[in-house]
Amino acid sequence: MQAIAIHKFARGSAQKARLVADQIRGVNVEKALEILTFSNKKAAELVKKVLNSAIANAEHNEGADIDELFVKTILIDDGPTMKRIMPRAKGRADRIIKRTSHITVIVSDS
């Protein structure tokens, strides 16, 4: 049995979120929540919300026991980038790139 949760268009780069995702891949969900709680990265909060949603989906939809769940798969994909302009001195302009990502967490009990 497995349950899925997805957060699309999460504000933050996929490269930074993958640093957090690599720490919890294949880990028991209780341990994963502990790791994310004490991480000081912004991406950890985003991943933690998606993980909690996947746990709730497993418990509600599948009737799974939380103690047996582990993070089977976690994917961080690039989302669309928002391009903005920042005015600079002497009539110039710099491009600001605001990156987004898609976070997918799959939890399983086997």
UniProtKB/Swiss-Prot annotation:
The keyword Nucleotide-binding does not apply. Keywords: Ribonucleoprotein, Ribosomal protein, RNA-binding, rRNA-binding. It comes from the Bacteria. Disulfide bonds: none annotated. Gene3D superfamilies: Ribosomal protein L22/L17. InterPro entries: Ribosomal_uL22, Ribosomal_uL22_bac/chlpt-type, Ribosomal_uL22_bac/org-type, Ribosomal_uL22_CS, Ribosomal_uL22_sf. GO terms for biological process: translation. The keyword rRNA-binding applies. GO terms for cellular component: cytosolic large ribosomal subunit. GO terms for molecular function: rRNA binding; structural constituent of ribosome. PANTHER family: CHLOROPLAST 50S RIBOSOMAL PROTEIN L22-RELATED (PTHR13501), LARGE RIBOSOMAL SUBUNIT PROTEIN UL22M (PTHR13501:SF8). This protein binds specifically to 23S rRNA; its binding is stimulated by other ribosomal proteins, e.g. L4, L17, and L20. It is important during the early stages of 50S assembly. It makes multiple contacts with different domains of the 23S rRNA in the assembled 50S subunit and ribosome. The globular domain of the protein is located near the polypeptide exit tunnel on the outside of the subunit, while an extended beta-hairpin is found that lines the wall of the exit tunnel in the center of the 70S ribosome. Part of the 50S ribosomal subunit. Belongs to the universal ribosomal protein uL22 family. This is Large ribosomal subunit protein uL22. It comes from Colwellia psychrerythraea (strain 34H / ATCC BAA-681).
